[in-house]
Amino acid sequence: MKSNLSLKRQDEKRADKEPNLYTLQGVIQYLQYEAFKNERDHNLWEIERAELKIRVAQLERERAKLEQSLSFQQRRAEMLEKSLRELRKDKNISVKDLDEFHLLDKPAANNTKADAEACLLKSKNYIKKSLQEIVYLTNMQPNVSWNVLQEPTRGIKVPKESNNTQQNNQFVMEPSQNKGNVNDANFFEVEYARNENMNKLSSSELISDDLLEDEIMKPLSSGESLPKKEEEVTKSPSFTLDDSVASNEQTLAQLNIESPVDQKKSKAKKKKEQKWTLKFESDKGTSTQCITHQPLPGSTPSFASGTENGVINVWRLDEDSNDNSMGIIKPHLTFYGHEGPVLCVCVPKATHHIFSGGHDGTIRCWSLPANQTSDSISKILTGSTIFQGHEDCVWELFCHEVKDNNPILLSLSSDGTVRGWKYTGEQLFKIRCDSKQPLSMSVTDSRIAIAYNDGNVRFYDLDTQILVSQMRIAGNSAIGNPAVKDRINKIVWKNGNPDRLYSLHENGMVRVFDVKSEELLAEKSISKVSLTGIAFAVNRPEFAISASDGRVFFLRQDDKLSTLESLPSREAQEEITDLSDILWINSPVDKLEHLIVGCKERISVYDRKYLP
């Protein structure tokens, strides 16, 4: 009695010294982990089961091929026997000769039959070994304790192993009254036992073809009879593959674990949500009429613009030459000389010059300073070469530079002419269409496309200035309203397969035509105001269009001109006559795309990461 009391006191002291290590949060985490592990193992078993079904189907197809080959050999043997009988009936061949031929062919026939039997025996042995492999894989499963997260619908009884090695271990469903015992234990255990009898099958035993399907689905030993088909056999709770996948996703969600599929979707969503951000703006009051690209050599992105007060500004998109803290962009170079607004700017690739056309009807050639010191940047440059010949406003300029040909400067004016110039100022040719006003132009290697106010685009040969063809893309704005609403503002010729002609209109319509077939490929109304500028992405089938209110729309180059996104203007303008232009350039150094938008009040520079 004393010993029992002393032991009890020692246990109480030990219990007081040892703290309780079990907490509610720890138990919940442990149970969640065990549930996740059980669900994962169950999903792996379901996947392995599906793979085994595929393997069984492959074996069945191989068996069908072997049976077909055997049937073909039997038919061939019957045909040979029939031909032999016909030869024996022939009167021209004696019985002695037939007997000699028969004796010669008999060993060969016997050999063929023996080979066929050997092939059939080999095939059946291969199928039998495959069945042994399937039974081995299905029976060699680990002992798994299922935690009862959900109430089981059936109990599973595991019979004890017997000493007789010829007896197979089967799993028989118990009646529903055993369900209470399972719930009392809070778990049920499934034991898998290896079928030892399958390893003792001799090579002389052959599987009957009639029982092959039943043997694959429910393997039996050679000494047992076939079970009844009504008897249901199971080894684990019945779950479909879809149910197990859904259960796994639910478990992952409860444990706050992100699946690989969700990770890929989140990455794609982040890439899709990448937007343009405003980086620089010019001082308010910089009224821009036109924008062009790359006037300066080097890797720093730059552009030139013309203003209403006759000034040409050259800008650089680097943080050193701009006030990055305030987000203000400053002109790098300034040229002045036009008597009125600058309507167009063009920069050739071969020389360090800038061409500009103005409201005063003149074209001016400006030289970029070789040494761009602080003095040349701070002061206004006024020296220029004047090209005279136009009698009215010069609206568009285009530098046409083709290999092995002299470069040509093309100009479009309100005086009704399109003229070609040398870079030195000498006029080469003049294209005029009687009583028609040119509105816009675009050039390829050997032809120039000119849009007129009668709604037609006329194609001329650059060498001979001869009209090649024409097609209608808009209404005749020369007759006044309502056709003036469909007036052409700008055209762009893009080479490709096929060559396409893009047109922007006064009524906010954009159209795409096939140049060769003159067929309308796409048409879309994207704004209620006039469209003024267009710029194409370098490495993707996308382009941007600017409207007269300063807004920018991004479209895809497909049959529907799908809208991608839009940039709202900083201050929407009520008037629809305020012009704007747009430029889209890539910067390989900092891996950024730049979008320059020039409107009435300012120049805005947006950028985003380069999208391959």
From Swiss-Prot:
Superkingdom to which the source organism belongs: Eukaryota
Entry's localization field: Cytoplasm
Gene3D superfamilies to which the protein is assigned, alphabetical: 1.20.5.300, YVTN repeat-like/Quinoprotein amine dehydrogenase
Stretches forming WD repeats: 286-325, 337-376, 389-432, 434-470, 483-523, 526-565, 574-612
GO biological process: one example: negative regulation of septation initiation signaling
Protein keywords: Coiled coil, Cytoplasm, Repeat, WD repeat
InterPro entries: Striatin_N (IPR013258), WD40/YVTN_repeat-like_dom_sf (IPR015943), WD40_repeat_dom_sf (IPR036322), WD40_rpt (IPR001680), WD_repeat_striatin (IPR051488)
Signal peptide: none
PROSITE patterns, per the entry: WD_REPEATS_2, WD_REPEATS_REGION
Region annotation (Disordered) ranges: 219-241
Key word Nucleotide-binding present: no
Primary localisation category: cytoplasm
GO terms under cellular component: cytoplasm; FAR/SIN/STRIPAK complex; mitotic spindle pole body; nuclear envelope; old mitotic spindle pole body
Keyword Iron-sulfur set for record: no
SUPFAM superfamilies noted in UniProt: WD40 repeat-like
Coiled-coil regions, chain positions: 39-100
One Pfam family of this chain: WD40
Protein name: Uncharacterized WD repeat-containing protein C1773.01
Organism, scientific name: Schizosaccharomyces pombe (strain 972 / ATCC 24843)
